[in-house]
């Protein structure tokens, strides 16, 4: 299959599984294989793991381009998500992309925000006042029609007030908007996203607050990154995924692949987590009731941890027999 999702609990060897998968594909002559981590720190961990098990790999040197060992499909290239997913990617965008045999996203849930941010431009009023002011002026009349008071608060720099530019105003003024962004494209806040937005401006929306302006797509165009989108094999690995829907609408995965991830059949805990606010479920479940009930529960089959804001807040738990540190 082209796409594969692997869910393994933390500590079950996801990294080694991923490295072995890519090495197997290299041995099968599937083409260059790319291992993508959420950040630079985890790149070092994966490299250490590969070195420990004798799996050949290569990394980016600071002053060189894409390693020849990767392009020749001799070694796995290990890098971080920001290196691949940005408008100035060394792997190319649009039609000028580097062909790959397999791309693996490790801790894929942690990579999602980075991929989304690659398509987003955030213009700070403090760091880039000129561009911010031009955009604010461009849509000033449209904002007044929505809410004159809110528009005045934004002009005054209120952090908590924001407005969305109506899509019809955005579409009518997209040419003027492109001229503003093009003139400022060398700015660090615009530079990396500009190649992705310049020909897709119609598919973006704009949010304006008193401190910044954010321009984001309705949905990311993952096909702009051909090295990932058109790889022969795409593998996502994670202990848990909070936003599986993004794999379909964002990464263009088949829904059936997302519904049927590869799991360890003997695994008792999936790694998925649930956050519950008891008082929103049942009004009678106030703080004192929850603390009392939980402290009286048997912990022979599972552990229980309570995080409190201060030492003073520990006393209620101490009185009920909890161990505090």
Label the predicted regions:
Residues 12-62, 83-86, 243, 305-315:
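Conserved Walker A/P-loop ATP-binding site and its immediately adjacent core
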Residues 63-77, 315-325:
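Conserved motor-coupling elements within RecA-like helicase/translocase cores
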Residues 60-61, 81-89, 209-223, 324-325:
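Short linear interaction motifs
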Residues 20-22, 62-66, 88-92, 220-224, ...:
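A generic local structural motif
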